[in-house]
Amino acid sequence: MTEIETIGFHYVVEAAGCDPEVLGNADRIRQIFLEAAKVGNMEVKASYFFKFSPTGVSGVVIVAESHISVHTWPEKGYAALDVYTCGTKANPEKAVDYILEQFKAKYAHVSEIKRGIEEDDETFTHMIMTWEEALRKNGNGSG
């Protein structure tokens, strides 16, 4: 079977059962994302995070390879996470795994989108693979 060439990988993650204290802390999420970029072998260019009142955070880290972004709902223990990278140097899956661990997520619904698949007629398409994971039981880190 031939490997499909792609311009980038986009991970769209629904993280549930997360620690509300982490999800409500913009500074902590910034630290997590900056470290996730390192773990995923990405070069950070800029970051911006905003804390909503009374709760929730939205933020983005721009990396040379593309971006890592999040929107959180601490009251629901939920975070919507995107990690998109171009090229072959970065490892977005490692970044996603690190973020889920730091958010103390119990469950994740993950879609990996292979983007920029070139077709014969100079157009591009994408391919999606989706899975769900139970990450933690009873908050003790065992899966």
Swiss-Prot record:
Residues flagged as site, Cleavage (non-hydrolytic): E65, S66
PTM notes: Is synthesized initially as an inactive proenzyme. Formation of the active enzyme involves a self-maturation process in which the active site pyruvoyl group is generated from an internal serine residue via an autocatalytic post-translational modification. Two non-identical subunits are generated from the proenzyme in this reaction, and the pyruvate is formed at the N-terminus of the alpha chain, which is derived from the carboxyl end of the proenzyme.
The protein's required cofactors: pyruvate
A Gene Ontology biological process term: spermidine biosynthetic process
Known catalytic reactions: S-adenosyl-L-methionine + H(+) = S-adenosyl 3-(methylsulfanyl)propylamine + CO2
Record InterPro entries: AdoMetDC_C (IPR042286), AdoMetDC_fam_prok (IPR003826), AdoMetDC_N (IPR042284), S-AdoMet_deCO2ase_core (IPR016067), S-AdoMet_deCOase_pro-enz (IPR017716)
Residue numbers bearing the Pyruvic acid (Ser) modification: S66
Protein name, as recorded: S-adenosylmethionine decarboxylase proenzyme
